C-alpha cells in the first residue's frame, strides 16, 4: 500500500501483542488509581495530571482519558522509526492521547479534522 497515493498506510504488527497487552493493562490500572484518588478526595476534582473523565460537551462523555501519558509517549517514540520507514517521511512526534472506551461509546468524526 502506497502512503503517497492513499495518504495513509497500515503497519501490521507495529508492536507485539505482549507490548500491547502491557500498555493496555498499565492504562487500565492508572484509571483505577485515578478513580480511587477521586473517591478518597485525595486530589481536587479539577486535577488532570493522571487523567480525567471527559465532560458532557466533549467527544465521549464520562470516559476516562489522558493527554501525554508517559507509557503512550514512550510507545510513540518506539513506533516512530517504523512509521518513518513506512511513510518515507521524517516525522516529529507531537502528542499522545489515550482513552478507555466503554460499551456503547462511539467516536464520531472529529470536528477539527476532515
Residue ranges, per PLM feature:
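Arginine residue identity/basic-tract feature
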Residues: 7, 38-41, 99, 109-113
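Pocket-edge structural micro-motifs
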Residues: 12-13, 100-102
